[in-house]
Amino acid sequence: MPYLLQVDFPYEGPWGEEMAAAMSGLAQSIAEEPGLIWKIWTESQATQEAGGIYLFQDQPSAEAYLAMHTQRLKGFGVPRVNGKIFAVNDVLSRIDRAPL
């Protein structure tokens, strides 16, 4: 069963294309994480937040990634990381065209 991880944290930029250029190495690293199916990068310049929505193959992979990524972000000086893990209801999600 896949698991969804929702992460957000305070972020002061850069945004958009500048963020993409600055974070491309990190994105390549995340793409290699065990159990990761996909990640959607999120950003809100209006609220000064960034984060992502991740789909993992299983709960242990999501939990391990959240623990590692929280430490990594804190190492970058991020004061607070919010993370939640949810089981995915495959049947209902497929009805609504989820990319599972």
Where are these regions (language model features)?
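Short S/T/G/P-rich N-terminal loop/turn motif that feeds into the first structured element of a domain
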Residues: 1-49, 59-67, 84-100
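A common structural junction motif
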Residues: 30, 70-77
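Conserved short beta-strand edge segments in small beta-sheet-based binding/regulatory domains
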Residues: 75-87
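A short, exposed loop/beta-hairpin motif centered on an aromatic-Gly-Thr core
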Residues: 51-55
